[in-house]
């Protein structure tokens, strides 16, 4: 399976790659234990520099999203749970970015909540289809 990445100007590719991978893991596009593409393969597929890809994969390993098995490659790990305070902190950062972008676009809080509900439902359906 190939990771999907839509390059957004103004945001570091490293951050976009991390987000795309985490989204793929959470949505069930990649299953626990499934092989993850090598640095070279992923860099070639996404047309990004291998050093950026290497740093992103190493970050995902350190954060517990991936596991490296010498001789076998890198596989998807169980998503890290972290402490509730850590999870809230990570979410807060994303919410701040979402709020700024929504305001910039002139959207109301209702628009944002509705869009979030739709996306949440899509993730639930994708996970269900993936056999979770």
Give the label of every model feature segment.
Residues 1-35, 41, 89-132:
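Extreme N-terminal segment that seeds HTH/winged-HTH DNA-binding domains in transcriptional regulators
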Residues 9-16, 49-58, 69-76:
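Short, mixed-charge, low-aromatic patches
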Residues 10-11, 28-29, 44-45, 67-72, ...:
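Short hydrophobic/aromatic-rich motifs at helix boundaries and adjacent loops
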Residues 14, 38, 72-89:
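Short, cationic-aromatic polyanion-contact patches
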Residues 29-30, 34, 59-71, 75-79:
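Beta-hairpin "wing" of winged helix-turn-helix
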Residues 35-67:
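N-terminal helix-turn-helix
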Residues 46, 80-81, 122-125:
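Short secondary-structure transition/capping segments
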Residues 47, 62, 79, 94-95:
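Enrichment for repetitive, rod-forming helical segments
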